Curated annotation (Swiss-Prot):
Protein name: 7-cyano-7-deazaguanine synthase
E.C. designation(s): 6.3.4.20
Cystine pairs: none
Tree of life domain: Archaea
Co-factor remark: Binds 1 zinc ion per subunit.
Native species: Methanococcus aeolicus (strain ATCC BAA-1280 / DSM 17508 / OCM 812 / Nankai-3)
UniProt similarity note: Belongs to the QueC family.
Chain residues that bind ATP: 7-17
Any one Pfam family match given in the protein's UniProt record, by short name: QueC
GO molecular function: ATP binding; ligase activity, forming carbon-nitrogen bonds; zinc ion binding
Transmembrane segments: none
Length: 234
C-alpha cells in the first residue's frame, strides 16, 4: 500500500514519515518551495530523510504563494519573531507570533496539491505532521481542519485518498519521545537530519536557536529527556 508524506523536513513531518515507514507502507514524499526563507535547508533535510526511509521524493515549486503573502517566512524585509521560553505556552504571545509567520491558505494549497500527487501515484493515504502544540494557534493544524479536508477529498479525488495525521493529539515533547522509539525500532537515526529553523543558516542542519520553531524544538528534547542532536547557533 502506498502513502504520500507531506515533508517539510521538520521534526513533526520527519516523525510522521517514520511512523508511515514503520507501518510497512511504500512511501512517496513531497516538499514545497513557496519562497520561504529556509527552503534550501528544508529541501536538503527532506531529501536526506527520504533517502533514509526509501521514499520517492518530489519537490514542487510554488512561486506564486509569496506574491500574496506578507509573512515573515516569505518576505525577507520582515523580521522573524522571537519568543522567550517562558512565553511558549502564553496563548496571546503565541498567537501574535503565529500571525507574523502565517502564509495565507498555505496548508489548504499544499494539501490540495499533495492530494493530486497521491491520486496520481495511486496512494491510499497522505501523512502530515499536524500536532496539538501548533494547533493551539494555527487553525489549519487542527483535528477539525483535518476532518473537513478529508470530507472534501471524498468528492475531490476519484480514488478517495485520505489524509492522516497520527500526531495531531501530541505535543512536541511527546513527538520527540515517539521519534526516539521509532529510531530504535527502525534502526535509523533520523531526528538529527530534521530541520525546524525559520532561517537559512550557513551550514546544513544548523539551527539559529532563537526563533519560535527552534525554541519549541529545544524545549521538546529537554522535556522529553532525549539528547538533542541539533547544533544551534545560540
Amino acid at each position: 500500500m502506498k502513502a504520500v508524506c507531506v515533508l517539510s523536513g521538520g521534526l513533526d513531518s520527519a516523525v510522521c514519515m517514520a511512523m508511515a515507514k514503520s507501518e510497512g507502507l511504500e512511501l512517496y514524499s513531497i516538499t514545497f518551495d513557496y519562497g520561504q526563507r529556509a527552503v534550501k535547508k528544508e529541501i536538503i533535510a527532506s531529501k536526506k530523510l527520504s533517502e533514509l526511509f526509501g521514499a520517492v521524493h518530489k519537490v514542487v515549486e510554488l512561486p506564486f504563494v509569496k506574491d500574496f503573502s506578507s509573512s515573515a517566512l516569505t518576505k525577507k524585509e520582515e523580521e522573524v519573531p522571537t519568543i522567550k521560553n517562558s512565553e511558549l505556552d502564553n496563548l496571546e504571545k503565541a498567537t501574535e507570533t503565529m500571525e507574523k509567520v502565517w502564509v495565507p491558505a498555505r496548508n489548504m494549497i499544499l494539501f490540495s496539491i499533495s492530494s493530486g500527487f497521491a491520486e496520481f501515484v495511486d496512494a491510499k493515504y497522505i501523512y502530515t505532521g499536524l500536532n496539538v502544540e501548533e494547533g493551539a494557534t494555527f487553525p489549519d493544524n487542527t483535528e477539525e481542519f483535518l476532518n473537513r479536508f478529508n470530507s472534501v477529498l471524498e468528492y475531490g479525488t476519484l480514488n478517495k485518498v485520505k489524509m492522516k495525521s497520527p500526531l495531531y493529539k501530541y505535543s512536541k515533547k511527546e513527538i520527540v519521545k515517539i521519534g526516539k522509539k521509532l529510531e530504535e525500532k527502525l534502526n535509523v537515526e533520523f531526528l538529527k537530519y530534521s530541520y525546524s529553523c525559520y532561517h537559512d543558516n550557513k551550514t546544513d542542519f544548523l539551527h539559529c536557536g532563537t526563533c519560535e520553531s527552534c525554541m519549541r524544538r529545544k524545549r521538546a528534547f529537554k522535556e522529553a529527556g532525549v539528547e538533542d542532536p541539533t547544533e544551534y547557533i545560540l
